């Protein structure tokens, strides 16, 4: 299956191709950078790149002859993708929980669950893109980009030999680790800080396209990196406050081991906040709520040990309110209208009570 994807890319024309990636996501950004830099090596130029979130990807107006989706579960938007496929060649490189196998519809849908033993949730988009592109040309110089995806999407435990090799190659990363900490965590935080800036996704991607190694980013080699670092420092202050004060501020149901954390954030850190809390308290299920706009309540679900299927919980708890959500077992996201906030909280408790037979 990886060979089929490699062959697909070999027959692309950059001027007729669009790469659509998961914006604001370390894994999505790294995967896009790997694909774009592979195109540069292979063809001498790069295709267009567009970012999207899972909730809005089906609203994109795409007309290119070739469309590559990376780190986006577009199989959940089956009708949209089938519509694109009428006039375009479509390749999907994704690792989120699969709803529809679009290979049955004549679309090249590359997903780890279809070809390997490593669970898709632990086979991030950046590693998937790297493995495909490695079959096309030598991209060993892009191996450090894979770490951004592996650690951002909590897949490091499954790739220790690869990680050992990359850490040994780039001494600026410090001592090898398989946890989200140290220099690799700092690198990811800088890249994802682009969410706070106007055209921040484009800025973060530009940085990844131009950097030769991690130190180019960690040591602020350009004005663009300095801008990302400044944004990250402001994010970190708010993140630390909410991580340290969750027991005072959140609704904690000890019986259900459920924490519903309704926060008012200045920065786009709800995903990072839920991940940080879940890492510190792996036995608990966290639901972080943040009103992004008058019509959007953003929800982040985390259960690091997979005791609760967050993908299921995100979908089941928001569907009655016209919401949409999904992701992986340990981590998922969703959106609903703020007017359903209290009913949503009751629905989450109801679902978990049924699960635990309480």
Predicted features along the sequence, with ranges:
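Extended amphipathic secondary-structure runs
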Residues: 245-246, 261-262
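Coiled-coil termination/hinge junctions
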Residues: 248-254
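Accessory alpha-helical/coil subdomains and C-terminal extensions
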Residues: 155-244
